[in-house]
Amino acid sequence: MAEELEHQPSLPQQANLTARPPFPIHVLPPKIRAMAEAVAAFMTTGKDLSAAVAMTVLNAAICGGVRIMHRGHPERVTPSGTFNVSIGVSGSGKSVIGGLMMKPIFDFEREAQERFGRDVRPGLEAERIEVEAEIKLLSNEAAKPREEKGADAKARRNRLTDLLRRKHEIEERMHPPQFIIEDSTVQSFARLLKATGGRVLILSTDAREIIANLLGRYNNGKADDSILLKGYSGEGFKFTRKGPNGIVETINVASTAMSMHIMVQPDKATEMAERKELQEGGLLQRINFVWSDNRPGRASLSKPIPPEIREDYQQFIFELMRTYYCAEGEVMFYLSDESWQALEDYKEAAQVAAGDGSHPSWTFHTRDSEIACRLAAGLHAGDLGDKAHESDIPVETIRRAITLMDYYNIDRMMIADNMEDRSDDKVMAKLRDLATTYPDGFSPREAQRKRIAGMHKGAEAVQAILDQKVKNGVLQLVDEGPPRYKFALR
């Protein structure tokens, strides 16, 4: 089949010949790559989108239980979930491609819910009926006049306490298996995390509602990303809110495990990427964005997805979900010594690329090595299936993960550049105001009062901006007296 796909009729060429390079589909594990290529041949809209979703599905299928660690550094344990946003214009096939690639996870959830309804819920219902009947019997006994009650009221109270505890436990166990969430308030999200032991997948082929919620639809317009940040890091979560009846509800989740892949059109991705709270809170820096090259499809070139490729892919993802997502407790993927060193070297290179911290790109690059580590875990599971935990992650897999990370950084750096441009626009506006107010030049102290470095930055940050503007030829120092600045004559 792989040979057949290599000899498909050529697809229509991209209109933009300077477009970013294609997704490095060659680094994907064989069964995953085969399905991504088959979906691309079926849709004829390009391989980027199907390949990007395929990589995400790998991490989603293991994130519930898998953590990554080097034996020599037990203090550094990394979750295996990844956050991803794929962007494509209307008509690029997002819904169909996403539906085909994510189908095994949705099917796994559906089958688990059907088994629960058939094999588990009836027994829980029967147990609840028995408990409620005994509660009613003891409640009726307690309601009798004192002279008609049994002798041992304390024993009855203790028994009622035990029964009510059992009833609460049964009701908690009656929540059907749920792995996927889409449109949700923070409150319902927190309740789901409580019911699932902190594990959840955020998957959607049309994430407008998810982004609306993230940007504050239920939070007075303020972006609400706290639960996602906790889930990405695997941290515990505590949610407290007063309900409409005045009762305070507290939900405690000891730890979280989360992965996300949402698909949107460019306008929603732009709205998300330009939101200041998400930039400053760090969510954007944790996301892999893929602006896909997908183009109009050609029905005459479409090839059906071979059933054996579809079935192999489905069963493989089922295998990963059973073994790793639904694992009891943690399953550790260990990094080999060479893999650990490769990630440390990559981290150092990323820190060098971040420069002196004057450009927002550094807030993205500090995450490069960690995200590559997570990607390597997904690739490792894709290579070895349910035996992945029996072997260390080899350095070759780290190199493949770094190839993916370098691809993701193309779009991540576009976001960082946009953040820098917007920040510089604000600085320049304030400098122009200072130049108008102080035509003979303004001092660093006056620039600090104008807060050219932002609300919470001090004299050192202000001076760094002024020095950079002088270096770039935007400002010049006034010749005489204490330091004062004017716009440079050009």
PLM region spans:
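Phosphate-handling catalytic cores of nucleic-acid transaction enzymes
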Residues: 1-490
